[in-house]
């Protein structure tokens, strides 16, 4: 919370919150607790990340320390070899100048000094081993365990040398039997000492065998040996003190050879020389193996040194066989150790199994070479085992007091002989050690190169920006590919639907073309109609009235036949009307019209004329002709099919239908062109789609190689993105929640202030009402007292004047009025008292609510303060985390700088230059590979970007094609809509034709009715003809009536009376005919062809 909010809360301490919002506060508190839990989880996650980073740092430190340890050991070993060679060269020059006696004295002095120095070195070793840093360095070297190699190498040699010691002891016993005369007193003491030594050596041999077996069973040998070295150094101090006492008591010609490691580790007398040891000798500078003591005696005999050659050869062969048998199994066990160490490397560095197999093969070959070197070395060191026997004899003879000058001379000769042997053996030993260490250097270089390669690979994997770019581009390209597929599928569906519609339209088109262009069918129909008319004319010649037949029935028969013909003609003419096309058919129509008129007339002649009647009654015939002619004149204007065909509206309809047919043909051509274009576009799209598919397949093959390597990084990036997004979302949600909380709190405070002000005003009003009520109560009580006092006075006065009854009545009335007033005032008082109690209860409740709200406000302030403290702590922890990350980065940089400085130091000796050159060549080769890989990556990126550009271009082209296709589709839709409109117009034309046909049928029915009327009128005329003489005047009246009726009937339909007049021309027609012309938009007068509108019409009333 800010200071402003605190100041508001402090100023508003008097205000109180209602109980309704307490639930909201509880919810807010719950939300704050959840937020705190979220912050704690985030802090835990950050601590986890920090621990992971620390582990990575420790791993890199381990690598650096291992490399430093290995290189320091090998450098020290090589320096030791160089120093030994220099000392040898100096020693050879000194030997020529000095005598043997001086050498022995100087050697004894050196041994004393070396013993003192060894004690000091042992103390230093203890201090170093106590340090944790040195222990960690030694514990963290799994790549090449030098001390393990050293122990195994020494134990091979020690076992075989102990066998030789046993043989030397047996020979010593034989010599003691020969010298019993001279050594009776000393022999007993020596036997006891020898027995003790045998027991100790037997125990040591068993222990060493067990340890040697454990070296090949357990892989944690190195760590166990480091723990043993501490206890081992303590025992060394005791042994050295004992050696000092023995050196003081014994005047040896050649003292003990003391061997110490350059790193400060002392070696037992039971251990032999390895590569990292210094050999301190006398001024002769001759070096021995680690457990050998070169001792000569004055009393020694020459036969101890000069033996038969056959015995020496047998002993050599036996030793070699035993040593070879012991080493047959050891190489495989040593190889197992190497494999186990390499597997440890693989677990740390996550190297593949294939690499391990390759390493194992190389190590097998190298170990074979090492084993052969060791065997050669042991074969050369057989002479040293012979010297051990002579050493022990020499120790025994030193304890004796008798020494002769002759024996001294022999010892001097033998000493020179031994020196020569030691030189030869030592040269071979140094060569084997050099070979061993060169092999070990190659191993370490291979491991270092692999470590460097692994670092480069990991650096590439953790290049997150590069991975994000590739993932983004891949997702973008894949989304576009899916969108294109969806669009293509949708277009295919639309294309199929359009094909179906096109097929339907083609079918309709075929039907329309068949109906519109088939003129032969129309001509055939016309020819059939003409033949029918001719047959009708031929049949009209037949007599109309036969004997025994009623003329009425005959007329009906003719009427039925005519109706049948008319129905047939209607069926043919329906097709004819719909398919009528050109103006060339008007001649045939005129012929049909004339034939129709001719038929009509002949039909009426059938009814009227007959040859027999002419012969019999010529007067009647004349009368019939006149009457028929009059009737024909009356019905000439009857509407027939021919009149309809020749009418102008029908011709206009035909013209419009021709125009529509022409437009349809044009639009069909356009549709065909558009279809061809659509097919071309589809073919192009299919080709492009196939091309794109081929490109994508090729790109996939190239991308899968890189995607397999990048999938792991994608997962890591996605996990990081999800975590970051979740964090951002949580923070945004928390910010929004806090903002909403602030807003709600401010709104609540404002509402509460308003409510409190209202409550204060209401309380003041209640207080005023209380005061007024109290005043009223006091006044009422005073009035009551006055009334009671007046009543008592009146009672007394009325008692005195009780005689008068009128006064009593008045008193009673007054008392009743007073009682009523008193009761009313009591009721009011009670009501006011109840209201006061209610108001007091409400005030108490409000006070309690205010107290509760005050407590809640305090709690809320406390919670806000806790939240502020938590946020501050969270910010501090974030700062600490950032500082830790910076420190870790700085440490990484420092370690890398140290590593680079150590690797870039110049090597001291010329022999390592060759190794440096090989290493530089390998690094160059690795850098070239790395450059090639980078070039390949750049090429791949360029290809990927080119493919992406091609995809974008293809997308743009496809979009353009889609736009063209959409435009063509819109045009096609417009044409299709026009076609639909034309079909609607044709339907309307067909409907109009149907209506006209129905109308024609109605007219035919009316004709039939008129024919019936005519037949009746003919009958009447016949009757009238008989009475012509009598009723000639009536005939004239009938004729006049018919003429007048003809004038009143409409000249178009010949059915209805004339109702409407056209003002422009003055012609009169019926209602139906005029409005039919208006509906068909033929707004012209049928007779004079003058145009008119509805405004030009006017109704006429003849009645």
From Swiss-Prot:
Q: What residue intervals correspond to the zinc fingers (RING-type)?
A: 1050-1089
Give the Acidic residues compositional bias ranges: 184-210
Q: Which GO terms describe its biological process?
A: proteasome-mediated ubiquitin-dependent protein catabolic process
The cellular component terms of Gene Ontology attached to this UniProt record, alphabetical and capped at eight, are: host cell plasma membrane; Maurer's cleft; membrane
Region feature (Disordered): 178-210, 271-301, 544-601
- Bias type Low complexity, positions: 568-585
Coarse class of the primary localization is: host cell
InterPro entries linked: Znf_C3HC4_RING-type, Znf_RING, Znf_RING/FYVE/PHD, Znf_RING_CS
Residue ranges, compositional bias (Basic and acidic residues): 271-280
Q: Which residues form a coiled coil?
A: 173-212, 304-330, 478-518, 650-791, 819-932, 993-1030
Q: Which keywords describe this protein according to UniProt?
A: Coiled coil, Host cell membrane, Host membrane, Membrane, Metal-binding, Zinc, Zinc-finger
Q: How is it used?
A: Possible candidate for an effective malaria vaccine as determined by epitope response in sera.
Gene Ontology molecular functions: ubiquitin protein ligase activity; zinc ion binding
Q: Where in the cell is it found?
A: Host cell membrane
Membrane topology term reads: Peripheral membrane protein
What is the protein name for this chain?
Trophozoite exported protein 1
Which species? Plasmodium falciparum (isolate 3D7)
Q: Which gene holds the coding sequence for this protein?
A: TEX1
């Amino acid at each position: 919370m800010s200071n402003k909010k605190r100041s508001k809360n402090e100023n508003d301490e008097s205000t109180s919150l209602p109980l309704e919002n307490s639930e909201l506060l509880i919810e807010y508190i719950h939300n704050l607790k959840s937020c705190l839990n979220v912050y704690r989880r985030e802090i835990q996650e950050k601590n986890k990340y920090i621990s992971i980073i620390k582990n990575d740092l420790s791993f890199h430190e381990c690598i650096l320390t291992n490399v430093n340890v290995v290189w320091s050991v090998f450098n020290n070993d090589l320096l030791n070899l160089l120093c030994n060679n220099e000392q040898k060269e100096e020693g050879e020059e000194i030997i020529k100048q000095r005598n043997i006696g001086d050498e022995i004295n100087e050697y004894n002095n050196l041994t004393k000094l070396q013993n003192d120095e060894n004690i000091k070195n042992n103390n230093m070793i203890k201090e170093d081993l106590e340090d944790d840093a040195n222990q960690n360095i030694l514990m963290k070297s799994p790549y090449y365990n030098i001390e393990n190699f050293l122990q195994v190498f020494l134990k091979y040699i020690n076992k075989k040398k102990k066998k030789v010691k046993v043989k030397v002891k047996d020979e010593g016993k034989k010599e003691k039997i020969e010298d019993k005369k001279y050594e009776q007193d000393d022999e007993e003491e020596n036997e006891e000492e020898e027995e003790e030594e045998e027991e100790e050596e037997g125990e040591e041999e068993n222990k060493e065998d067990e340890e040697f077996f454990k070296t090949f069973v357990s892989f944690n040998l190195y760590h166990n040996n480091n723990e043993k070295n501490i206890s081992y150094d303590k025992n060394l101090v005791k042994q050295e003190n004992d050696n000092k006492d023995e050196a003081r008591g014994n005047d040896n010609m050649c003292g003990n050879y003391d061997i110490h490691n350059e790193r400060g580790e002392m070696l037992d007398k039971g251990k032999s020389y390895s590569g990292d040891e210094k050999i301190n000798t006398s001024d002769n500078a001759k070096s021995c193996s680690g457990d050998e003591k070169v001792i000569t005696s004055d009393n020694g005999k020459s036969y101890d040194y000069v033996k038969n050659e056959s015995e020496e050869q047998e002993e050599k062969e036996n030793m070699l066989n035993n040593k070879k048998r012991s080493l047959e199994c050891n190489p495989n066990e040593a190889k197992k150790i190497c494999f186990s160490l390499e597997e440890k490397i693989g677990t740390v560095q996550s190297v593949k199994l294939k690499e391990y197999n390759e390493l194992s093969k190389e190590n097998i070959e190298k170990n074979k070479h090492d084993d052969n070197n060791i065997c050669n070395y042991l074969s050369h060191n057989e002479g040293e085992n012979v010297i051990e026997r002579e050493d022990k004899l020499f120790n025994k003879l030193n304890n004796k007091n008798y020494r002769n000058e002759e024996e001294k001379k022999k010892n001097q000769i033998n000493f020179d002989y031994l020196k020569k042997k030691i030189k030869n053996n030592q040269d071979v030993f140094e060569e084997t050690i050099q070979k061993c260490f060169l092999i070990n250097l190659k191993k370490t270089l291979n491991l270092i190169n692999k470590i460097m390669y692994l670092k480069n690979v990991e650096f590439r994997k953790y290049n997150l920006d590069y991975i994000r770019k590739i993932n983004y581009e891949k997702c973008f390209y894949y989304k576009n590919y899916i969108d294109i597929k969806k669009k293509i599928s949708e277009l295919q569906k639309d294309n199929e639907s359009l094909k179906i519609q096109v097929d339907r339209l083609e079918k309709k088109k075929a039907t329309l073309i068949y109906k519109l262009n088939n003129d032969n069918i129309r001509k055939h129909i016309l020819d059939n109609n003409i033949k029918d008319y001719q047959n009708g004319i031929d049949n009209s010649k037949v007599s109309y009235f036969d004997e025994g037949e009623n003329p009425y029935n005959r007329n009906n028969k003719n009427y039925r036949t005519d109706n049948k013909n008319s129905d047939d003609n209607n069926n043919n003419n329906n097709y004819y009307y719909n398919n009528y096309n050109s103006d060339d058919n008007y001649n045939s129509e005129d012929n049909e019209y004339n034939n129709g008129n001719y038929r009509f007339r002949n039909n009426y002649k059938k009814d009227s004329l007959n040859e027999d009647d002419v012969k019999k009654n010529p007067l009647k015939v004349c009368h019939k002709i006149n009457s028929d002619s009059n009737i024909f004149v009356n019905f000439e204007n009857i509407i027939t099919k021919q009149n309809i065909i020749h009418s102008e509206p029908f011709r206009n309809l035909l013209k419009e239908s021709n125009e529509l047919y022409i437009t349809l043909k044009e639009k069909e051509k356009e549709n065909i062109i558009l279809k061809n274009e659509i097919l071309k576009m589809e073919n192009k799209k299919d080709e492009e789609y196939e091309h794109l598919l081929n490109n994508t397949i090729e790109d996939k093959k190239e991308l899968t190689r890189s995607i397999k390597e990048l999938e792991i990084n994608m997962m890591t990036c996605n996990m990081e993105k999800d975590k970051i997004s979740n964090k951002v979302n949580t923070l945004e949600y928390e910010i929004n929640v806090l903002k909403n909380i602030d807003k709600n709190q401010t709104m609540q405070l404002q509402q509460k202030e308003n409510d409190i002000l209202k409550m204060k005003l209401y309380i003041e009003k209640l207080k005023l009402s209380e005061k007024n009520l109290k005043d009223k109560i006091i006044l009422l009580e005073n009035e009551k007292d006055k009334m009671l006092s007046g009543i008592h006075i009146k009672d007394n006065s009325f008692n005195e004047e009780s005689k008068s009854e009128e006064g009593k009545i008045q008193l009673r009335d007054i008392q009743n009025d007073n009682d009523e007033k008193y009761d009313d005032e009591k009721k009011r008082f009670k009501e006011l008292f109840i209201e006061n109690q209610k108001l007091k209860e409400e005030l108490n409740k409000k006070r309690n609510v205010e107290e509760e709200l005050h407590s809640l406000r305090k709690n809320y302030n406390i919670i806000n303060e806790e939240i502020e403290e938590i946020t501050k702590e969270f910010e501090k922890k974030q700062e600490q985390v950032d500082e830790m990350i910076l420190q870790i980065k700085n440490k990484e940089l420092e370690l890398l700088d140290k590593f680079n400085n150590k690797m870039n130091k110049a090597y001291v000796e010329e022999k390592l230059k060759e190794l440096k050159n090989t290493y530089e060549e390998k690094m160059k080769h690795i850098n070239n590979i790395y450059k090639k890989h980078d070039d390949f990556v750049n090429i791949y990126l360029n290809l990927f970007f080119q493919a992406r550009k091609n995809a974008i271009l293809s997308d743009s082209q496809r979009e353009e094609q889609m736009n063209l296709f959409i435009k063509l589709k819109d045009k096609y839709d417009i044409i299709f809509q026009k076609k639909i409109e034309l079909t609607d117009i044709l339907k309307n034309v067909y409907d109009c034709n149907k209506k006209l046909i129905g109308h024609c049928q109605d007219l035919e029915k009316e004709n039939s009715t008129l024919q019936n009327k005519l037949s009746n009128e003919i009958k009447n005329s016949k009757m009238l003809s008989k009475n012509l003489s009598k009723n000639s005047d009536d005939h004239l009246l009938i004729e006049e009536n018919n003429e007048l009726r003809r004038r009143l009937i409409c000249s178009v339909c010949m059915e209805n009376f004339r109702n409407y007049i056209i003002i422009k021309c003055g012609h009169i027609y019926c209602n139906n005919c005029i409005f039919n012309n208006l509906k068909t938009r033929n707004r012209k007068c049928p007779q004079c062809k003058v145009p008119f509108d509805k405004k030009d019409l006017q109704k006429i009333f003849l009645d």
